[in-house]
């Protein structure tokens, strides 16, 4: 036993007395954690391979590669057990690592039990290179194994990660900056040729959601960190998608470089000056020079998992140039573990017991306002119209309610329950979050002093903006196609079958109204909201407890369809729901009367907002564009059958009280059957927004909606109609022509002249215009699908320069 204990000490005596700078590492060389020979250096001394103490627990060590000449010895690679078990190799101080005389690299503990080896044999020597790559080589100089082939969370200049045909190669973020355990984010170089970032489960690593990608399925070749400092994804056709440009970041001679998937899910490229106060970046610290995605707090909204931060917390930024995400608890909440904030937050008081009666609950709890935080999910009830006091009372007496959200302008109240997910700072909605906490008169005290401290200083906690409304999981049923629904009413009437019973399969959760009910609700169909080809829309109010505002459409023009086709279509549409589709509340099928009842959209159609004298804020227009894109994506790709809207225009995009865009009026919609990508039909839509293929003898596809969206996107950017005959410069008459000319001449700024907010965000303006020009390609096959469109708008994928569209004929009135 004594011999075993003395063995590592004997190895230290036989080994060199310090970490040596050497070109080759010979067989028999040994490292031990607490000996002078604890690492092998590269020839320049820039990098080291060996034992690195674990932060916070110096009794244990990693097998790692690190930058050796900088003060914090930044780790760029660390050993993991196996692909099947990606846990880190963490060993006690009496372990040793040896390049054995048998030609193997072996990590053993004091008893001689092997704890790790890279599973290669016949090694003749090893080398720690100045690139940061530790290599095991054969006698003929061929590489047997290298750390560059087994990346952890970082890549270095000259490192290449190819798309493997049989197994994904990936970077896995750490769990925390000082915790090297496999974390919650993954950069995947996939076998299908795509490079993507994923939110993943811990510890299993199963993928939750992709939140950024190059969208290069079938075309990707390799992820490259060039020796000039440029990070890009090479494609099989020889082109490159830049992850970072490499421009303006200083020479490789003056700076150390690395690109790391950080614990907050952002893939950042960093530089560090090799000399004190060197270069324009200055400072002896790592500085981020590029990052993907640009705003991680807004990039992830996942139905599964907690989002960027843990449950019941929210994501903001640390205020530094590196834009590191910072997770925070709302007031009266505290972290489960201050050292592991990714675990989320919990209430710092005794939760509301469901055994309390209403009077006791009102005595023990109250609501306190907070501002500027957004938890987009977790809604479970909505009240409208209602006062703020009543909104608060309904939350206080409900043991499931953790907070209420109130909109003063529309008298609307939403209740949210725990756990709260996807929390982030938000600056684009004016609403108040009412957080349920112990009453100031209650005998219940806060559990920790941190919450009391916040309570005393809560006036300083105002964050300066308000909460975005999440989608209610109980109330987001999309409206049924007017055309299809009217036909269904006629079929059901002819057969003397009540509409609600005509299909036992569809089981649509819709209310049946009588004609008298709707006549009374609309005060005799008095106030007209709008009119379309199939009928007139009136404003009304239901006589329910909440006095719900509604929009009632009287259908007066129907076309016959076969019952079989209609039943297939109505069942499909009736089962759809999305926050960017207007919700159908019910219907009337009484005699010859056909009426549809919709949720009322406070701010009316987009054209009213967009083309009035006052220009909407740039961020408002951005959110509207993204909302319309996501609504179309749902119709095209996420329904059981694809739905082509066929009439996307500003008049058919309605805005709720928070200016959330919702697609409406499915009167011209067309469904595609399974495995069908095109359909033949007569010309539908509105002049100025219909795609060129409508005028040709070819089938139409979802790409007609993509074309219409391209027109609307330019209207949102420019805040003007597609065609304006009274402009001074006739070259600006048709916005699609004008935008193309501005893009080709490099004068995108002319499209937003006088719009200071847009000018400030000119890069995003250019991105939106580029996406629009892709949508407006005359050849439908050249247009992106709506998934690609949303990714391009979000900045999740690179956007190549669009071809010059051959024709904008359909934009003409």
Swiss-Prot record:
UniProt entry keywords in alphabetical sequence: ATP-binding, Disulfide bond, EGF-like domain, Glycoprotein, Kinase, Lectin, Membrane, Nucleotide-binding, Plant defense, Receptor, Serine/threonine-protein kinase, Signal, Transferase, Transmembrane, Transmembrane helix
Any one Pfam family match given in the protein's UniProt record, by short name: Pkinase
Occurrences of domain Bulb-type lectin (ranges): 22-149
Reactions catalysed according to its record: L-seryl-[protein] + ATP = O-phospho-L-seryl-[protein] + ADP + H(+); L-threonyl-[protein] + ATP = O-phospho-L-threonyl-[protein] + ADP + H(+)
EC top class named in words: transferase
GO molecular function per UniProt: ATP binding; carbohydrate binding; protein kinase activity; protein serine kinase activity; protein serine/threonine kinase activity
Family of the protein in this entry: Belongs to the protein kinase superfamily. Ser/Thr protein kinase family.
Name of the protein: G-type lectin S-receptor-like serine/threonine-protein kinase LECRK1
Gene it is expressed from: LECRK1
């Amino acid at each position: 036993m004594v011999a075993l204990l003395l063995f590592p000490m004997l190895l230290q005596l036989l080994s060199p007395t310090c970490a040596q700078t050497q070109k080759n590492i010979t067989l028999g060389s040994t490292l031990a954690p607490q000996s002078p020979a604890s690492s092998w250096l590269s020839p320049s001394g820039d990098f080291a391979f060996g034992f690195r103490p674990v932060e916070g627990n110096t009794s244990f060590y990693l097998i790692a590669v690190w930058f050796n000449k900088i003060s914090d010895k930044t780790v760029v690679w660390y050993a993991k057990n196996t692909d099947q078990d990606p846990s880190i190799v963490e060993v006690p101080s009496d372990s040793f690592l040896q390049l054995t005389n048998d030609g193997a690299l072996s990590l053993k503990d004091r008893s001689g039990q092997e704890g790790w080896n890279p599973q290669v044999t016949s090694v003749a020597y090893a080398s720690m290179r100045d690139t940061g790559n530790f290599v095991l080589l054969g006698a003929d100089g061929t590489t047997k194994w290298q750390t560059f082939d087994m990346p952890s969370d970082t890549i270095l200049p000259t490192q290449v990660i190819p798309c493997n045909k049989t197994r994904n190669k990936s970077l896995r973020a750490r769990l925390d900056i000082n915790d090297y355990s496999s974390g919650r984010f993954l950069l995947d170089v996939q076998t299908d040729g795509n490079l993507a970032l994923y939110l993943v489960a811990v510890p299993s690593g199963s993928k939750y959601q992709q939140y950024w990608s190059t969208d290069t399925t079938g075309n990707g070749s390799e992820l490259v960190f060039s020796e000039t400092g440029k990070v890009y994804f090479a494609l099989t056709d020889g082109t490159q998608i830049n992850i970072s440009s490499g421009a303006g970041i200083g020479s490789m001679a003056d700076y150390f470089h690395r690109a790391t998937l950080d614990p907050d899910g952002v893939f950042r490229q960093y530089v560090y000056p090799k000399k004190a106060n060197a270069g324009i970046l200055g400072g002896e610290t790592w500085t981020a020079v590029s990052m993907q995605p640009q705003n991680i707090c807004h990039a992830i909204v996942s139905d599964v998992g907690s989002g960027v931060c843990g449950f019941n917390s929210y994501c903001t930024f640390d205020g530094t140039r590196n834009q590191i995400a910072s997770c925070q608890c709302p007031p009266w909440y505290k972290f489960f573990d201050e050292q592991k904030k990714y675990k989320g937050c919990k209430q710092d008081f005794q939760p509301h017991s469901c055994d309390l009666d209403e009077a006791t609950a009102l005595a023990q709890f109250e609501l306190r306002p907070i501002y500027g935080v957004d938890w987009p999910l977790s809604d479970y009830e909505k009240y409208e119209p209602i006062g703020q006091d009543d909104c608060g009372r309904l939350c206080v007496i409900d043991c499931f309610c953790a907070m209420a959200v109130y909109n003063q302008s529309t008298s609307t109240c939403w209740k949210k329950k725990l756990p709260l997910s996807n929390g982030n700072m938000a600056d684009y909605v004016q609403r108040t979050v009412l957080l349920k906490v112990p009453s100031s008169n209650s005998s219940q005290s806060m559990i920790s002093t941190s919450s009391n401290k916040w309570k005393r200083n809560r006036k300083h906690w105002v964050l300066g903006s308000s909460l975005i409304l999440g989608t209610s999981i109980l109330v987001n049923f999309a409206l049924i196609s007017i055309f299809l629904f009217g036909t269904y009413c006629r079929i059901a009437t002819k057969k003397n079958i009540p509409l609600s019973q005509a299909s036992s399969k569809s089981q649509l959760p819709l209310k049946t109204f009588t004609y008298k009910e709707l006549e009374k609700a609309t005060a005799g169909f008095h106030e007209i909201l709008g009119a379309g080809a199939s009928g007139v829309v009136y404003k009304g109010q239901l006589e329910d407890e909440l006095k719900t505002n509604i929009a009632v459409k009287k259908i007066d023009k129907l076309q016959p369809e076969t019952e079989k086709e209609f039943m297939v279509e109505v069942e499909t549409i009736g089962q759809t729901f999305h926050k960017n589709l207007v919700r159908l509340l019910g219907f009337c099928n009484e005699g010859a009367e056909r009426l549809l009842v919709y949720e009322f959209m406070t701010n009316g159609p987009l054209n009213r907002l967009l083309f009035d004298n006052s220009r909407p804020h740039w961020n408002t227009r951005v959110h509207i564009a993204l909302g319309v894109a996501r609504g179309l994506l749902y119709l095209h790709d996420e329904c059981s059958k694809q739905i082509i809207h066929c009439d996307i225009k500003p008049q058919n995009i309605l805005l709720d009280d928070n200016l959330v865009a919702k697609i409406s009026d499915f009167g011209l919609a067309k469904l595609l059957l399974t495995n069908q990508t095109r359909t033949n039909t007569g010309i539908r839509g509105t002049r100025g927004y219909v795609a060129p293929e409508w005028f040709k003898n070819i089938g139409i596809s979802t790409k007609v909606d993509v074309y219409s969206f391209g027109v609307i996107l330019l209207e949102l950017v420019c805040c003007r109609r597609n065609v304006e005959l009274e402009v001074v410069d006739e070259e600006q008459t048709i916005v699609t022509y004008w935008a193309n000319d501005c893009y080709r001449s490099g004068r995108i700024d002319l499209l937003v002249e006088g719009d200071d907010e847009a000018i400030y965000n000119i890069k995003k303006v250019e991105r939106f215009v580029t996406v629009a020009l892709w949508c407006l390609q005359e050849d439908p096959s050249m247009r992106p699908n709506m998934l690609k469109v949303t990714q391009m708008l979000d900045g999740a994928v690179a956007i190549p320069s669009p071809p010059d569209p051959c024709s904008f004929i359909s934009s003409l009135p």
